[in-house]
A protein has these predicted regions:
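Active-site-proximal, structured, solvent-exposed surfaces of multi-pass membrane proteins
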Residues: 2-5, 654-925
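Membrane-embedded helix bundles of polyisoprenyl
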Residues: 15, 111-123, 130-214, 226-247, ...
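Membrane-interface coil-to-helix junctions
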Residues: 19-113, 138-159, 249-253, 262-291, ...
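Transmembrane catalytic cores of multi-pass membrane glycosyltransferases
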Residues: 44-54, 60, 198-201, 217-303, ...
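Extracytoplasmic/lumenal acceptor-recognition loop(s) of multi-pass membrane glycoenzymes
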Residues: 68-76, 470-492, 507-576, 611-612, ...
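Membrane-interface micro-motifs in multi-pass membrane enzymes
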Residues: 75-80, 99-112, 132, 137-166, ...
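Transmembrane alpha-helical segments
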Residues: 113-121, 161-173, 205-210, 303-311, ...
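Contiguous transmembrane helix-bundle modules in multi-pass membrane proteins
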Residues: 175-179, 183, 195-197, 323-497, ...
Length: 925
């Protein structure tokens, strides 16, 4: 066969090898379809699967514009979701099959990545042998970024498109069509807007370096013009989609939210640097590296070895120097992002909680380009006649295999111990020493080993030895890190999440949007409402506004990062928000809940005893109440209660009859099994409870840490997520915790004495709010309010309410959004924002027929604009491309100046400022 013909087969061979190897991993690990193992992990189980469920439901009869499922509703446009191949593929599966379908989807994704990589390298490196063409494609496919972040399935689309974008840019520079680049970038900007900006930045930085270093001076202006035309066309086409994306995300709590692994260091550092408060914390930290970032360099030992060999040869051969300079500078810039936290943060637009180096696939791409360039241009010249090749091969094999033998067990052990994966392997210096130093050292050994292999004179033997090592290295690591094996603790855990959600969904499948379910013991994952297809408060979509989150916090619900959590709240606030049903693995208070399944199944299911109707009527004082004006949720809820025309209080602050305090020393187990002694304060408080009350506790500040709570001598079990073995010795009664940090229910008592014993790790009794909710008053309120007729159709709500006067406000338990439009008895009226972030409508005396409809204008405009903008952008690319020769040279010069300015800004903002800041603050620390 001809060599060219063989190369074309690589487009099939590389994806085929990828599919076979992944199926082998699935088979030996018992992953679906070969067992109950799963690839679900990290982001996918809490974020990905629930999103796929929601989009599937929206396209199977739900609303494309509004989501009633969680957090009392939020706008959510999924009209363009089917342009996303993930969501399109999963739309054809039953809801209960989606957790299994993603296992198949991952194989497809990896095959697509290997195909696009092999296609791009085939076109970019024409002399590259079929063997190495296949090898670099597989190196890119199973790179550290992909096997670390494969659960973020959407990211793999960008990984697949990135080689094509670079190929299309190179073809533009060779005076080929600009349309492929325009189409690829337009698709990225429209469907994956956030991720596409990593690509835009990389084009400015790395393609800019290519233009300035490698391209001839007389061709630079033409290249910049071609790049500018293609990019401009893509930006024009996707302009409204970009505007809509940032318009939506700028209103969310995630926008500007900065909390990451450096928080503890930043707090310590800031203590002596008050004069630098205006500078972001991440610029004040010195070099910051963790195992997640280093994983981006997995398999790049050969690339670094090739870079060193290119530099050595460039010293003797002048034509190679510009390529050596380009690869070296690009590699150093990526190293800056790895070690300087500020650089990584700027690449992420200022914040992230986890998943550092979201553009880490660029390291793999640069590495593959290095390897391809080396074997395409240099390897044929690189034979060195040295005797005793067997010794050289043996030493290299031992060196490289040592990295596999020594580091894989470490990674497997820690990966098994830490359910969240690599993202938390930065919290302790023990982890730093245990993982990062060996990883770095063995990486260096691998580089040395591959360089030594170059001493083999026979080209085929040294290639075979190199490929053998790479095969063992990549297959071992990918097998270890992709998927959770059948019967493993993590596979059982993740499978149980969905089984539990499906069970709850079957029980409450008939609940409408105003019959919300609550999971106070957080035994279900945060996004269980999407999996179970039932309405609830619990939400983790990153799409809630801060005011929306604050409104739930004011009602007593817990909050973690951008999550709203079911734990916390009071019987009164739940009744207001129409929490009608409760599900828990623990048995709950019979005074508040009515059992409905008699403990059958994995959960105890209850009907809430205290439920207020939809469309409850307040007096107009409710419009003047703001949560921030009250010291705690109980005073705030008392004020809301008064807007029913009540002159007394629903919540009473409880004063203890006596308090006894004692100090003690307790041993606390910390990570690694070490014991640390800490001083604790134990408080006994005695109360005389009159009438029937539910006692609630909350903390006045964030400095309180309670080790345990006992009521009348019996330890109280507080709602929280399961403890992670080996990380902490958390008592089942600790409070507050990450996912239970607002209001804690202590129990219901009637005309009796109650002894509350609280053991503090931090803080004391004066830091607590302890209130009692009068159940007789709440019951009276619920009985005097009659139900109102209502109906919900997708994103439309009809409600009939009767009021006694014209100075009333109808409260509708839906989160406020200015896009809600309302008619009252056929006439347009304003939708009011009350109680922080909920909907109110000013009522008329008598019957009120209220009709709410969520406006789709902006969402529909997004679709309508996309089509004409596509042709406008395409026209710009075609017209300017064809007329390039007659365009005045001044335009080329102007565009070149603009590009140079953008390049300089990118270098200063992304690299120079954070690097200098890191060095300066490290010196003055």
């Amino acid at each position: 066969m001809k060599r060219g013909f063989d190369k074309k087969y690589i487009l099939i061979i590389a994806p085929l090898i990828t599919a076979i190897w992944l199926l082998a991993i699935y088979y030996f690990k018992g992953i679906y379809p070969f067992g109950t193992g799963t690839i679900i992990d990290c982001y996918l189980y809490q974020g990905g699967i629930p999103i796929y469920d929601y989009v599937r439901d929206a396209w199977h009869g739900g609303s494309l514009f509004y989501d009633f499922t969680t957090a009392c509703g939020a706008g959510r446009d999924v009209t363009l979701a089917l342009l996303d191949p993930n969501k399109l593929f999963l739309t054809f599966f039953r809801r209960d099959m989606i957790p299994n379908a993603v296992c198949i989807l991952l194989i497809i994704k990896f095959c697509v990545v290997s195909f696009t990589a092999s296609f791009s390298f085939l076109k970019l490196f024409e002399r590259l042998s079929p063997t190495w063409l296949c090898a670099v494609s597989l190196i890119y496919t199973f790179s550290g970024f992909n096997i670390e972040y494969f659960t973020n399935l959407d990211w793999l689309d960008v990984v697949a498109l990135y080689p094509l974008i670079l190929l299309f840019i190179k073809r533009m520079f060779d005076n080929k069509s600009k349309i492929p680049y325009y189409l690829a970038l337009t698709y990225l900007l429209t469907v994956f807007t956030y991720l596409s900006f990593f690509v835009i930045v990389s084009i400015i930085v790395f393609v800019g370096l290519y233009i300035f270093i490698i391209e001839d001076k007389n061709k630079r202006k033409e290249d910049i013009f071609s790049l500018g035309v293609g990019t401009l066309g893509a930006l024009v086409t996707s302009s409204y989609s970009i505007y809509r994306y940032y318009q939506l995300i700028s209103t969310t709590a995630r926008f500007g939210f900065t909390k990451s692994i450096f928080n503890n260091e930043a707090e310590v550092l800031n203590a002596g640097q008050e004069s630098f408060e205006f500078i972001p914390d991440y610029l004040k930290l010195g070099p910051q590296v963790n195992i997640v970032k280093l994983m981006m360099y997995f398999g790049m030992e050969l690339a670094v070895a090739c870079l060193i060999l290119i530099i050595i040869r460039a010293i003797r051969e002048k034509p190679l120097r510009k390529y050596a300079s380009f690869f070296t500078i690009s590699f150093l810039l990526l190293i800056c992002q790895t070690f300087i936290l500020g650089v990584d943060m700027f690449w992420h637009f200022g914040s992230y909680v986890m998943f550092p180096m979201r553009n880490g696939y660029m390291i793999a791409m640069l590495g593959c380009l290095l390897i391809s360039y080396y074997y395409n241009n240099i390897d044929c010249k690189d034979g060195i006649r040295i005797k005793n090749n067997i010794a050289k091969i043996t030493f290299a094999l031992v060196t490289c295999f040592a990295s596999v033998i020594l580091i894989v067990p470490r990674i497997k052990v820690f990966y098994k111990m830490i359910p969240a994966g690599f993202d938390v392997l930065t919290q302790e210096f023990t982890l730093l020493k245990s993982m990062i130093y060996p990883f770095s050292t063995l990486f260096l050994f691998g580089v040395i080993g591959f360089i030594i292999l170059k001493a083999i004179d026979n080209k085929h033997i040294r290639s075979l030895a190199t490929l053998t090592i790479l095969t063992v290295y990549f297959s071992t690591m990918s097998f270890a890190l992709i998927g959770n094996a059948e019967n493993s603790a993590k596979a059982k855990e993740y499978n149980s999440y969905y089984e539990n959600a499906f069970e709850v969904g079957n029980i409450y499948e008939k609940n409408d949007v105003f019959s919300r379910v609550n999971n106070p013991d957080v035994s279900l994952i945060t996004n269980y409402p999407y999996i179970a297809k039932i309405p609830s408060i619990s939400n983790w979509t990153y799409m809630l506004s801060q005011s929306q989150i604050d409104a739930f916090i004011a009602f007593g619900f817990s909050n973690a990062y951008t999550r709203v959590i079911d734990s916390g709240a009071t019987a009164f606030s739940k009744s207001l928000l129409r929490v009608t049903d409760t599900v828990s693995k623990d048995e709950l208070n019979d005074d508040l809940y009515l059992p409905i399944n008699n403990g059958q199944g994995n959960f105890n299911c209850y009907r809430n005893k205290y439920i207020l109707p939809v469309g409850i009527v307040f007096n107009n004082n409710i419009c003047n109440i703001a949560p921030k004006d009250y010291e705690n949720t109980f005073e705030y809820q008392n004020k809301i209660y008064s807007c029913f025309g009540k002159n007394d209080e629903l919540f009473e602050e409880l004063a203890p009859e006596s308090i006894n305090t004692s100090n003690d020393i307790k041993d606390i187990k910390i990570f690694g099994g070490n014991i640390e002694k800490t001083e604790i304060v134990r408080v006994n408080a005695n109360y005389e409870i009159s009438n029937k009350k539910v006692i609630y506790l909350s903390c006045k500040n964030k400095n309180v840490s309670i080790d345990n709570i006992a009521i009348n001598g019996e330890v109280l079990k507080t709602p929280n997520l399961p403890d992670y073995e080996g990380m902490t010795d958390r008592n089942v009664s600790s409070f507050p915790s990450v996912f239970n940090n607002n209001v804690l229910e202590l129990g219901t008592f009637e005309n009796c004495k109650v002894e509350i014993t609280i053991t503090f790790n931090k803080g004391d009794f004066s830091d607590l709010n302890i209130y009692g909710l009068n159940l007789e008053k709440l019951e009276e309120l619920c009985l005097e309010k009659s139900e109102n007729e209502y109906s919900v159709n997708k994103d439309k709500v009809c409600l009939n309410v009767t009021t006694d006067d014209s100075d009333s406000i109808v409260f509708i338990p839906i989160s406020y959004d200015e896009r809600w439009k309302c008619t009252l008895n056929g006439e347009k009226t304003d939708v009011l924002c009350i109680m922080g972030d909920f909907i109110g409508v000013k009522a008329q005396q008598g019957n009120n027929e209220i009709f709410l409809e969520y406006s789709h204008k902006e969402d529909i405009l997004n679709i309508v604009c996309l089509i004409p903008l596509f042709f406008i952008g395409l026209g710009i690319v075609i017209l300017l491309g064809k007329k390039q020769r007659i365009i005045p040279r001044s335009c080329f010069k102007l565009l070149s100046c603009v590009f140079v300015i953008l390049f300089c800004i990118a270098m200063i903002v992304l690299y120079i400022i954070p690097t200098l800041s890191s060095v300066i603050f490290a010196l003055i620390k």
